[in-house]
Amino acid sequence: MEGKGIRLPKLGILTLIRHRKVKAGGKLKSVTVCHEKDGKWYCSISFEYPKTELVYPKPSEDMKHIGLDMSATHLYVDSNGELADFEKPYKKLQEKLAREQRKLSYRQKDSKNYEKQHKVVARLHAKIKHQRKDRLHKLSEQLTREYDLISIENLDMSGLKQTLNLGKSYSDNGWGMFVTMLLYKGKRNGCYIIKIDKWFPSSKTCSQCRYVHKDLQLSDRTYVCPVCGNLIDRDEQAAINIDLEGLRVLLSA
């Protein structure tokens, strides 16, 4: 690393647009340069830092905890009833992308105009990808710093997409990538990440009296408990139950 650039073998010093400052005290381990479909070059730099002893908070009922229930329309609903502040770039840019893809279909393949339009489409795809990844990074960092315990469901994403025919929605919200970020950032920030058993009836269990509503259908978006009369949004209730179960699992470990 030299000034605002980086020295690479045979290429010399290349100027970099840095997205964040490099933490002091690290040893440069590797540099990966890649050329993406949008025509831009990206450089991924890895540093090694001395190991520091990570201190997790002592498990207790007083610790700050939250449960997250995955959502197709939003990234998640949490146990406080809040929806993730998550931009869905593919939905937002879908109309523009479709328009540019139609233009591409009218171009003669292998012509200069085709190649030019192909780059426009590629840039849109790259913009969507980078917006989504950036937002996921910010959300996962915020949560793992704010909470001592985050509980989520242990879901089979591939099976869920096929069974419920929700592939596009669930691929767009990036839940799998989000969980991966939570796991490694939880270790880094001293936050417990508990995965609840996928067979745990989070949606069917009343968060007030613990009655299990076995006849609840996927189309029922509001939970009405026939025992205590609890009336609550289905996803919010699932998040509350995930939160309670995660805390129980941690305290009993």
Model-derived regions, located:
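Positively charged, helix-rich recognition surfaces that bind polyanionic ligands
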Residues: 24, 37-253
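Acidic carboxylate diad motif detector
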Residues: 1-36
